[in-house]
Amino acid sequence: MGIDKRAEATAKDVQGKAQEAWGDLTDDPKLELEGKAKQVEASAEHKKEDLKDQAHRTIDNV
């Protein structure tokens, strides 16, 4: 299990949310989109780690 990878993904998600909110607050659509993109990246990283964990569990049960 990649706890470090999950922590990095969570940090990226929080950073993306903050960046999106700041972009909204300052009426900067580019900054908002960059924040949303970071959140999508973080979500993908979490899903990747979920799949890796599931694969390890499946292998352990064989």
From Swiss-Prot:
Region (Disordered): 1-62
Top-level taxon of the source organism: Bacteria
Residue spans of biased composition, Basic and acidic residues class: 1-15, 27-62
Entry-linked InterPro entries: CsbD, YjbJ_sf
Protein family membership: Belongs to the UPF0337 (CsbD) family.
Name of the featured protein: UPF0337 protein gsr0040
